[in-house]
């Protein structure tokens, strides 16, 4: 249990996510029945750019790194994620628990592993949605439904199941880390420091478990509220 359990869960869930992503890559660029493989995708994306060019992209193309919108998103993402890394207790717990000789290597490798997920999904499912002209509204796209829509168009019901599995793995992995992070702050930094300095091990465990339940319900309730807005 505890932090060790989150490490194991993160590792296993990441494996499942990567296997799912590799399945999508194979379906898009290897199996040529629907997309036409690499050449078919290229032709479809060039044709799509001629029909509806992207404002801010070089020549309005989809296959370009020269994108004003992409640059703006990158700046916002990098600046915004500084807060995620330096303020999130989950990162600090991992840094403190790891050996000093392994911390830098671990975080660099973790960053590369994370980068592979959005980059590969964008270059497979994102481009597939454009190439196959998936019927999706702007509102649905802003809600993050491009990937499931593209997966369904590409692989049918199996694609939707794979996306759901991948999403479940990501949410539970991140959720378990945050539960442990919040419970440790409440238990040791607040309860034992200010409320009960002489708390026994059983009392600390009780507070930790109560915090996990309360924070878990709070996250679920907040998710429902945000979905209904």
Regions found by a protein language model. Give the residues of each.
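Membrane-embedded helix-loop-helix hairpins and adjacent transmembrane boundary segments
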Residues: 1-229
